[in-house]
Amino acid sequence: NYGVFDDDTAYDALIDLKGSSDIIADMEQYFDEVIQAEYIGYDEAHYALVSAAVIDSVINSFVYRCDEEDYFEWTSSQKCFDFSPLKQKAVTAIGAILSDNSELRELWEENEELYEAWKEDKLSMQKRLQQ
């Protein structure tokens, strides 16, 4: 399994976003941490990817496989927010996570069987957010 939500850390990020009192500011912070990092840590990468996935779900109605039962209802309820100003940062953060300076990418690269699928999944999200 190589999806955004195939990791416990991703669910921690989702729980934090769902509990956020200022989701736009929190997402921007998660993206900025990744974009500005010399080396992107595992947790930071997940927080940025989950933020990007939520934006993708809200703006593009993209359906992610997610074990959180109310994910789709919750993302629908976020349509009142304008996430479009964050799209470029999300795209940049995904690019950074796929770069050589990313712990998450390094770990996935060790999985010869699923690395390409994981990478393509993130590139597809990035492409949708560029539109």
Predicted feature residues:
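Short, surface-exposed loop/turn segments at secondary-structure junctions
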Residues: 37-42, 66-70
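Amphipathic alpha-helical elements of HEAT/ARM-like alpha-solenoid repeat scaffolds that form extended
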Residues: 6-14, 48-55, 122
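Alpha-helix boundary/N-cap detector
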Residues: 22, 46, 81, 85-89, ...
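Low-complexity intrinsically disordered segments
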Residues: 87-131
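Short terminal alpha-helical segments
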Residues: 1-40
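Short, solvent-exposed segments of well-ordered alpha helices
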Residues: 38-45, 77, 81
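Amphipathic protein-protein interaction modules
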Residues: 49-106
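Residue-level detector of well-ordered alpha-helical segments, enriched
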Residues: 26, 43-50
